[in-house]
């Protein structure tokens, strides 16, 4: 996963943002807040996780599918990413 290592700082920044959003949500649940505000925070977390997933998938597709010269390996890598997408979309 060389692409993940190369983009490590960017991915870590995204995970830190998600972590902060989850901490804020936990605090919201401990205090009285409007349901709409809680739902908005959950939607923000979901959007941040989706963005992280998009970046990792994009890197994986570029490095392991597009630039893969070995046809067998390319198909194996494609199967892996399709299984991950199936589990993510459920």
Swiss-Prot record:
- Is Cytoplasm there in the keyword field? yes
The molecular function GO annotations come to: DNA binding; metal ion binding
Its cellular-component GO annotations read: cytoplasm
Entry keywords, A to Z: Cytoplasm
**One family name in Pfam for this protein:** Trns_repr_metal
Biological processes, Gene Ontology terms: negative regulation of DNA-templated transcription
The record's InterPro entries line, in alphabetical order, gives:
Metal_Tscrpt_repr, Metal_Tscrpt_repr_sf
Location of this chain's protein in the cell: Cytoplasm
| Sequence similarity | Belongs to the FrmR/RcnR family.
UniProt-recorded name of the protein: Transcriptional repressor RcnR homolog
Q: Which organism is it from?
A: Salmonella choleraesuis (strain SC-B67)
High-level lineage: Bacteria, Pseudomonadati, Pseudomonadota, Gammaproteobacteria, Enterobacterales
């Amino acid at each position: 996963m060389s692409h993940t290592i190369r983009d490590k700082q960017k991915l870590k920044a995204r995970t830190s943002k998600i972590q902060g959003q989850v901490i804020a949500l936990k605090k919201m649940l401990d205090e009285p807040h409007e349901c709409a505000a809680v739902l908005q925070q959950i939607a923000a977390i979901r959007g941040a996780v989706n963005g992280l997933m998009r970046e990792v998938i994009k890197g994986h597709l570029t490095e392991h599918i597009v630039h893969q010269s070995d046809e067998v390996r390319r198909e194996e890598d494609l199967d892996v990413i399709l299984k991950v997408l199936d589990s993510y979309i459920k």
